[in-house]
Amino acid sequence: MAALKYAGLEDTDSEEELPPGWEERTTKDGWVYYANHLEEKTQWEHPKSGKRKRVAGGLPYGWEQETDENGQVYFVDHINKRTTYLDPRLAFTVEDNPAKPPTRQKYDGNSTAMEILQGRDLSGKVIIITGANSGIGFETAKSFALHGAYVILACRNMSRGNDAVQRILEEWHKAKVEAMTLDLASLRSVQNFAEAFKSKNMPLHILVCNAAIFGSSWCLTEDGLESTFQVNHLGHFYLVQLLEDILRRSSPARVVVVSSESHRFTEIKDSSGKLDFSLLSPSKKEYWAMLAYNRSKLCNILFSNELNRRLSPHGVTSNSVHPGNMIYSSIHRNWWVYTLLFTLARPFTKSMQQGAATTVYCATAAELEGLGGMYFNNCCRCLPSAEARNELTAVALWELSERLIREQLGRRSP
């Protein structure tokens, strides 16, 4: 089962496991009680811990609460066409303690994207995610789709994109999801994608700039720029520019830019303190894959912050995120050294679902409505590097990006 499986209800291990013969149930208004079938009695307190609990949040998308002829609450899963007396929210109970003031649900590095969206209905929301055919992008897209959103997977490889769509449809055949061609290494492809999306006459509520390359050998794109810089930054910059009018018409809208903690370990200015284009798009002789990636991730935060400063007055906010360290995904496929390193580190790192959590949080959290210009790690706001917070550098990068795009478009003109 789609949403329920990822909520963790298939895992029966618990610090408060019930004794034999006991069952956990919920009332109509969400209070948890315990049935002792051996003695045919019920009670509010957990038989071992003595705690009282209630369920947190609404039902998962596609679920409905009903009452049978005996007055007992049961739950209908309309997605998978089944009923159960087990409340799907029991994985998210909170202690009822009058001595403690109520606090909102807290998410951290162990949270999953499906947990973030527990009880949310995203019907009517249109979401674009770049690089969504695999890895964290795929988990992000799947999580949105399983909660009712219309999700567009913007992918360079349409065969893989369509495979990703089918994998989501296998989990829920009514998911609203499609793949569209987008190659961020080509400004022409970005333009074609934007035109194709505009022709659909759809709103755009959430744009997730997720796609990235890492560890690639030096090469120039068809636009004459170093590929890591163009794919990870400039292509996304151009995409947002082309879709800006739709985002503004769809407000409140959000942009989420996937960056990395590696942004802290680089510099993009020369000795005089000016933005250095030769560092952003280096020659083959000056190229090092790790530095190129780090610089592009610094660009991501600078871009997100400046985007928020420019568009937040129009109802469009932008935040940047770090998904997690050493997550095993396809991003490192171009460099065997990192493939080996990521493989060895895999048992100690986040899952893909956990890696998608911070993106999903920034895209949907009610408490972030109207708020932007921030950087998040493990679903919590944190301070990026001093350089990432430099407004003058952000403006310089914005102006450089606009100039590079104008130059490339000018070369195509007859």
Curated annotation (Swiss-Prot):
Pfam families: adh_short, WW. Keywords: Apoptosis, Cytoplasm, Golgi apparatus, Lysosome, Mitochondrion, NADP, Oxidoreductase, Phosphoprotein, Repeat, Wnt signaling pathway. Its main location: cytoplasm. One of its GO terms (biological process) is intrinsic apoptotic signaling pathway by p53 class mediator. A motif (Nuclear localization signal) lies at residues 50-55. Gene3D superfamilies: 2.20.70.10, NAD(P)-binding Rossmann-like Domain. One of its GO terms (cellular component) is RNA polymerase II transcription regulator complex. It comes from the Eukaryota. Residues 16-49, 57-90 form the WW domain. Its EC number is 1.1.1.-. The active site is at 293 (proton acceptor). NADP(+) binds at residues 131-137. Residues 1-23 are annotated as: Disordered. GO terms for molecular function: enzyme binding; oxidoreductase activity; transcription coactivator activity. Substrate binds at residue 260. Coiled coil: none annotated. SMART domains: WW. It is found in: Cytoplasm; Mitochondrion; Golgi apparatus; Lysosome. Belongs to the short-chain dehydrogenases/reductases (SDR) family. Putative oxidoreductase. Acts as a tumor suppressor and plays a role in apoptosis. May function synergistically with p53/TP53 to control genotoxic stress-induced cell death. Plays a role in TGFB1 signaling and TGFB1-mediated cell death. May also play a role in tumor necrosis factor (TNF)-mediated cell death. Required for normal bone development. Inhibits Wnt signaling. This is WW domain-containing oxidoreductase. The lineage of its organism: Eukaryota, Metazoa, Chordata, Craniata, Vertebrata. The gene is WWOX.
